[in-house]
Amino acid sequence: MRIRERSLTPVAALVAGLLAGVVGTVCMDTFRYLAYRRAGGKDSPLAWEFAPVESWAQAPDPGLVAKRVVEGFTQRELPDRWAFPASTAAHWGYGSGWGALYGIVAGSLHDPRPLYGLPFGAAVWSSDYAVLPLAGLYKPIWEYDAKTLATDLTGHLVYGLGTGTAFWLITRWWSGVTRSPRCAPGA
C-alpha cells in the first residue's frame, strides 16, 4: 500500500539521471577492470582507474574527444600535461551526461524499469560507432573485429543496466513509495 508519492520533476529526472550515469560508469569500469584482471593485470582498481596518462598519444578516446573540443574552441594546442585530467573528466562527464539524457527520457515514462537501461546502453554504443569515426577518433565500425565489438557492446550494456537500475532506485526513493508499517520487513 502506498502512503505517499511525490511526482518526479524534469530537474529531478535530470539530476537522478546524472547520478545514475555515474553509477553506470562505475559498473562499466568494473566490467572492464575485471577483464583487465582476467588478462593478467595486477593493478588495484584505483590504480587502474586513475592510471596516469602522460601524453595525448596514450589518451583514451574520451580524452581525445575532450582535446579536440577544447582545442576547437580555444584555437590552442593542449599540452600533454592536460592528457590525464582531460581524459578523466571526459570519461566521467560522458557517462554522467548520457545518464542525464536517460533521466530526461525515462523520467517522462509512467513507470521506468531497470531493464530499459539495456537498449539505452546499446544506443550509446551505436552512437559511439556512428559519431566518433566522423570525428576521426574511431575507425569505421566494419574495420573492427567481432570480438572487439562484442566486448565493447557488452561493456555498454553493463553501463546501461547500471544506469537504468540506479535511476529506478533513485526515483523510487524520490517518489517516496513506501509500504505500510505492518508490511515492513520484520513487522
Spell out what each predicted region is.
Residues 1-187:
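Short amphipathic, positively biased membrane-proximal segments
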